[in-house]
UniProtKB/Swiss-Prot annotation:
GO terms for biological process: lipid storage. PANTHER family: F27J15.22 (PTHR33203:SF4), OLEOSIN (PTHR33203). This is Oleosin G. The lineage of its organism: Eukaryota, Viridiplantae, Streptophyta, Embryophyta, Tracheophyta. The chain crosses the membrane at residues 14-34, 48-68, 69-89. Expressed in megagametophytes (at protein level). It comes from Pinus massoniana.
């Protein structure tokens, strides 16, 4: 008898099961109601959609393109505004994010330009000496 009594659920478990059962039944009912409404809506609206599709499809296409255009124009405007703000802060010396990378790249480009200039000066002198060797009177 004690084993049977140990396996019986307590009132909290019973209340939890009843709550689970009731909420599951309500959700199942709402799912069926939604499915029924969807089917009835499709049955009623399909002939209307087919009849007006020569008007609705181009209209939907135009609306989609217009909305996409406005959203992308706004996004590009926001990107340009943030780039101008960053550039303003950089010029004013306020050190915006990424300024270190820009300074490093500028130094690398300047160093490379200096090396190219020095190499061109050396190579130009080398060519000048070769020309004088080839044509001593020139």
């Amino acid at each position: 008898m004690q084993k049977i009594h140990d396996h019986t659920p307590n009132p909290t478990q019973i209340l939890g099961f009843i709550t689970l059962f009731v909420s599951g039944a309500v959700l199942l009912f709402l799912t069926g109601l939604t499915l029924t409404g969807t089917v009835v809506g499709l049955v009623v609206l399909t002939p209307v959609l087919i009849f007006f599709s020569p008007i609705l499809i181009p209209l939907a296409t135009v609306l989609f393109v217009a909305v996409a255009g406005f959203l992308s124009a706004g996004g590009f405007g926001l990107a340009a505004l943030s780039a101008i703000s960053w550039l303003y802060n950089y010029i004013k010396g306020r050190h915006p994010p990424g300024a270190d990378q820009i300074d490093y790249a500028r130094m690398r480009i300047a160093d490379t330009a200096t090396h190219v200039k020095d190499y061109a000066r050396e190579y130009g002198g080398y060519l000048q000496s070769k020309i004088q060797d080839a044509a001593p009177g020139a």
